[in-house]
Amino acid sequence: MNIAHTIFGVFGNATALFLFLAPSITFKRIIKNKSTEQFSGIPYPMTLLNCLLSAWYGLPFVSKDNTLVSTINGTGAVIETVYVLIFLFYAPKKEKIKIFGIFSCVLAVFATVALVSLFALQGNGRKLFCGLAATVFSIIMYASPLSIMRLVVKTKSVEFMPFFLSLFVFLCGTSWFVYGLIGRDPFVAIPNGFGCALGTLQLILYFIYCGNKGEKSADAQKDEKSVEMKDDEKKQNVVNGKQDLQV
């Protein structure tokens, strides 16, 4: 295996591990409060599916020289499974049913891909089938921050887009993109090239808006207006009281 190929793969493992562990802060809060509050559980089973498909694609009988792809995505699959189970434990009944349904579909999709690739396909056909499946869900995973980027542009604030998370999205996408180029593997290079581009856009947005306080939310503006009205009422009451004393 090419030394540069290995170096970028190891670096990709490190940055991807950071991204997988990033939601642990959210889950500490969920466990502490014994509630999922307003957090969405959808990203975790979807990321789990991406990890399972990518880990499967990296296995030697599917694609050669991609063991590092399997190791990090196998680790990610374990981490995401833990997240899903915690979310299911603390979620309200309606949300629990929805997330369990998505989780079941994820396992069904992965099982279908694995069984078809094992018993119906061989050689390049197997690699093509598994690679396409992994690529589609990798792009979907990388595209998930688009809503946050839109929020940043709308509010002119980076409050909901932490710098280090954006940085590691960029580093992870870039390292695996180069890894795919060196290994001449389009199924690794293409989705991670997309991730590299999105990470770059996130960093550009961060540096454009990092000095802004941003537009306040409607609720915050409403609260401030309410406080101001109460202050005005107090001042008016004081004035009226003084007038009564003078009379």
Swiss-Prot record:
Residues 237-247 have a biased composition (Polar residues). The keyword Disulfide bond does not apply. One of its GO terms (biological process) is protein homooligomerization. It holds the Pfam family MtN3_slv. Keywords: Cell membrane, Endoplasmic reticulum, Membrane, Repeat, Sugar transport, Transmembrane, Transmembrane helix, Transport. It is found in: Cell membrane; Endoplasmic reticulum membrane. Mainly expressed in flowers. Changing residue 57 to A: Loss of sugar transport activity associated with reduced plasma membrane localization. One of its GO terms (cellular component) is plasma membrane. Optimum pH is 8.5 for uptake. The keyword Signal does not apply. Induction: Slightly induced by the powdery mildew fungus G.cichoracearum. Residues 7-94, 130-213 form the MtN3/slv domain. Residues 221-236 have a biased composition (Basic and acidic residues). This is Bidirectional sugar transporter SWEET1. The lineage of its organism: Eukaryota, Viridiplantae, Streptophyta, Embryophyta, Tracheophyta.
